Design a protein with these regions (language model features):
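N-terminal leader/linker segments that precede catalytic domains of diphosphate-processing enzymes
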Residues: 1-147
Length: 147
């Protein structure tokens, strides 16, 4: 048991949509790089740990109205980094993702350039999971649903 492990704040998002053919729901999943130390190679919902920049940016773009501020912003950032999808924007150009991942542009600039209209009513808090205490690295993860 490792009860003294510091919990790492993180956020995960389940992006769902109606299937165009089957009348069921489709859920976005991504495959993690095999060299990542936590769940490497697994298929997962987009998500990750809160970065320091998330704290400042969540205030500047008014993510705090949801009561989850930095966690909502983290979920937004992670789904974009991992899949290229900008929630609240139709068909954001791939160039933004490539530029962000190569540190040529900040997420703040992506938000501005893509004219993202945040509709936080569609990002619904869904669950909170904490990694069991027998793991050496533990996360306090909030899950959000977005359609």
């Amino acid at each position: 048991m490792n009860d003294n492990t510091v919990l790492i704040d993180s956020a995960t998002i389940l992006v769902i949509r109606d299937s165009e053919t089957s009348g069921t729901l489709e859920v976005l999943m991504v495959k993690r790089h095999p060299d990542i130390d936590f769940a490497g190679g697994a298929y997962v919902f987009p998500g990750g740990k809160v970065d320091e920049a998330d704290l400042d940016l969540s205030k500047s773009v008014n993510f705090n109205q949801s009561g989850f501020g930095r966690l909502v912003y983290t979920a937004f950032r992670e789904v974009f980094e991992e899949s290229g999808l900008i929630l609240g924007s139709a068909n954001a150009p791939e160039k933004y993702r490539d530029s962000l991942l190569s540190d040529q542009i900040s997420l703040r600039e992506v938000i501005k350039n893509a004219s993202v209209d945040f509709d936080l009513e569609h990002m619904i808090p869904f669950a909170r999971w904490i990694t069991p205490n027998f793991y050496p690295k533990r996360f306090d993860t909030r899950f959000f649903l977005a359609k």
